[in-house]
Amino acid sequence: MSQVKRTPLYETHRALGAKMIPFGGWDMPVQYSGIIAEHNATREAAGLFDVSHMGEIFITGEPKIVLDFLELVTCNSVASLSDFQVQYNAILNENGGLVDDVTIYKFSVEKYMICSNASNYETVTAHLLKYLPASGVKVSDQSPNWHQIALQGPKANEIFSKFLGRELDSIKYYHFALLDYQGEEIIVSRTGYTGEDGFEIYSSIPFGLKLWSGLSELGKPQGLLPCGLGARDTLRIEAKYPLYGHELNNQWTPIESGIGWIVKEKKNPYFSSGKILSQKKNGTEFKIVAFALTEAGVPRENFRVLDFQGNEIGKTTSGTFSPSLKKGIGLASIRTEKIKDGEPIQIEIREQPKQAIITTKPFIPGSIRKN
């Protein structure tokens, strides 16, 4: 059995009284003061998350060869990216399933960075190396050299701007900047996984520790709290964001996973592009949708979804009690013909059918500043 890894902030989490759990091969904080308090702090003020377990994989080389390589293994259009733009994308396997969902950072025509999930970045690196051209492209997993934290919430911009001593409004949603702070170059990305405005900040490990401490102290009067994986999960479900291993896996295509909006037609074919584009046009048997309970109950993963005749039409993939809505919500893979906004369904919780409705609208408005 491989040894559980610890982030550079492990001792800080212990000192803060965090409850630690294994996640994706890492020992991570699930909560500090409490999931609901941390969730609400992020929605109303700011939350600080240790995400240094994520992977950073750099792709460099000759511009055309690099671009062609990235276009082959992904479904979104990397060619559409401008310098210093970020893109949500998926690394595909040969059958159109997801090796991982990722964000791709374009520094220049010669340099890109892929941010991958903690449990997958070694798999992603191996997959990329498997299909690497004979020359012209280099793939480098630099995850051990980077520290990443996320500052999220409606007050994130105010807090981080004050910390840096400069405005950050020029960094638009899903864009990033290379900033110099006291001689340290950091990557500041206006992205996140909460449905709120905020930043994901990449730096050296020593600076990352200072950044966590400085932001914690500066943000505390504003209501900032350190947040664990528990709040990260409730926040992302409210935002209808998928999680690998739940809504996403190596069998389901992007269409079946509910992220069909990132599937694009490209100049050249990519892995299973014929199959995936056909699904986008003609539909699939199952698809990920969101639902909300209309009576008391807390849904979890792998609960049966029923129609009102009692027929099984799918399974839940994620579920939680929503601190913002104060009711049970979740995501599920269900038969496509049953997907309609407001359609009544049932979620079987402890062998008891609980009434729910499908919702295609956002659960929460959030504070994201779209460009």
Swiss-Prot record:
Q: Does the keyword Transferase apply?
A: yes
Keyword Transferase set for record: yes
Catalysed reaction, written as an equation: N(6)-[(R)-S(8)-aminomethyldihydrolipoyl]-L-lysyl-[protein] + (6S)-5,6,7,8-tetrahydrofolate = N(6)-[(R)-dihydrolipoyl]-L-lysyl-[protein] + (6R)-5,10-methylene-5,6,7,8-tetrahydrofolate + NH4(+)
Q: Which Pfam families match?
A: GCV_T (PF01571), GCV_T_C (PF08669)
Q: Which gene encodes it?
A: gcvT
Q: Which UniProt keywords apply?
A: Aminotransferase, Transferase
- Family stated for the protein in its record: Belongs to the GcvT family.
Write the signal peptide boundaries: none
The protein's name is Aminomethyltransferase
